[in-house]
Amino acid sequence: VGVSAFSDSPAQAAELPVIADYQGVDFTALMALEPDLVLAWGGGNKPQDIARLKSLGLEVYISQPQTLDDIGTELLEVAALTGQTDIGQTLVTGYRHELEQIKQQYQQLAPVKVFYYMWSQPLMTIGQGAWANKILASCGAESVFIDSPIDYPEVSVKQVLLRQPALLI
């Protein structure tokens, strides 16, 4: 019934009201929609917002995938919560099959060094612990900031150029 800012998939998401962004949840807008289930991102939603959602009596599913396989597991859990188990199983089977094909295609190649452009003001990318590195690794790429101890570091254009990425994402 509602989405977070910049939700663009599926295309119908653009037609739904925005009830959250990087600053947090718009509780007035959310409650007006009377949701049956709220999907939250453990790494992206503020803990106090998640606690408030629960205190309001809403059913909250907290997504916290750590691996690419976790995405399939969580999709099955959400499918069960929404009564769409068969559709969920079909989607996850397809997802896991395609993921395995991609991994096999790139596993023997040397990783391509990439700059993953995450945000512009300030310029941010992904470091060692960012989940996006798992996606990059599965298709034969690696962040030029993989050595950063910060998961989502702020960087300068000069730092990016010094690392000489072969590709900008």
Question: Where do the model's predicted regions map?
Answer:
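His/Asp/Glu-enriched short active-site or ligand-binding loop at hydrolase and phosphoryl-transfer sites
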Residues: 4, 129-152
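Short helices/loops that flank or line small-molecule/ion binding pockets
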Residues: 27-34, 56, 155-164
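A short, structured surface patch at a secondary-structure boundary
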Residues: 1-33, 37-44, 49, 144
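Short, glycine/charged-enriched secondary-structure capping and boundary segments
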Residues: 15-17, 52-55, 76-77, 129-132
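Extracytoplasmic substrate-binding proteins
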Residues: 37, 47-124, 142-150, 163, ...
